[in-house]
Amino acid sequence: MFITDDDYSVLVREEIKDILLENYSETKLRAAEQMAIDQVKNYLSGKYDTGEIFSRTGDARNSHIVMITLDCALYHLYTPIPRKMPETRAQRYQDAIDWLKLVAKGEGTADLPKIKNESGETLSGIRFTSKYTAENNRW
């Protein structure tokens, strides 16, 4: 498992975790974690080897990805009870999504393993950009 119960102790106190899980089962907690992992994978999959990133365990994991995944999982746990959601939780989730969007666009960097081809060479995509906005010149 990519996320462990010990990871939660860094971001939330144990009593807050207990409040969140009041009406939840272990299955719902794991489902929220899987949703968060899939969400992060969807943003990173174009440039980074998400299979390798999320197969790591313990200290081999990237701590920033662990933090972002936890922020997303905790946000998903709070979603059914929005009145209990602290402002910091919503802000941390938005910060995580903003960073993931930057990395997905190629405007941010991450110390993560890049996608490689069968011969082990790092793949890099070609991206065309322009400082001019797109225009529709149909008459």
Regions found by a protein language model. Name each.
Residues M1-N62, E121-W139:
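Conserved short "hinge" loops at termini or chain/domain junctions
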Residues I65-L77:
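Solvent-exposed aromatic/hydrophobic patches embedded in short alpha-helical segments
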